[in-house]
Amino acid sequence: MAKKKKYGVVVSRYGVNTGLQVGSYVPVADNSGAKEVMIISVPQVKTRLRRLPSAGVGDLVVVSVKKGTPQMRRQVVYAVVVRQRRPFRRPDGTWVSFEDNAVVIVNPDGTPRGSEVRGPIAREAAERWPRVAKIATMIV
């Protein structure tokens, strides 16, 4: 079920509902300098013709920084979705949803650009991205 992929992490979808599609504006939950980003691509997601690719908790996305420090603005970077408003079901039967959507800016190898993550992150994202989980304050 889980396979080693190009980005150096084990990919396993857990059946997470995808709550963020291409074009969504999402706040950034770390201190990398970016405040708000727009999702421009979801790597390795194949979908039907003319359907927008979407991402869920734990997915890697390509984003464009829209608001933030002058050094970060207008850059195209990778990010990991750590929170989403749309409810998703865990294997034990519980449903989880957060108050907001949020991403964490990462390098292509999965190391976070910031040194701390504000707010909780989902357990699915923490298991899939251990380096992001290391700087998180709370895992739900």
UniProtKB/Swiss-Prot annotation:
Q: Which GO terms describe its cellular component?
A: cytosolic large ribosomal subunit
Which top-rank group of organisms is this from?
Answer: Archaea
Q: Which SUPFAM superfamilies match?
A: Ribosomal protein L14
Under Gene3D superfamilies, the record lists:
Ribosomal protein L14
Its name, as the record gives it, is: Large ribosomal subunit protein uL14
PROSITE patterns, per the entry: RIBOSOMAL_L14 (PS00049)
Q: Which GO terms describe its biological process?
A: translation
Q: Please provide the record's keywords in A-Z order.
A: Ribonucleoprotein, Ribosomal protein, RNA-binding, rRNA-binding
Functional description taken from the UniProt entry: Binds to 23S rRNA. Forms part of two intersubunit bridges in the 70S ribosome.
Its assembly, as annotated, is:
Part of the 50S ribosomal subunit. Forms a cluster with proteins L3 and L24e, part of which may contact the 16S rRNA in 2 intersubunit bridges.
Q: Does the keyword RNA-binding apply?
A: yes
Q: Name one GO molecular function term.
A: large ribosomal subunit rRNA binding
Q: Which family does it belong to?
A: Belongs to the universal ribosomal protein uL14 family.
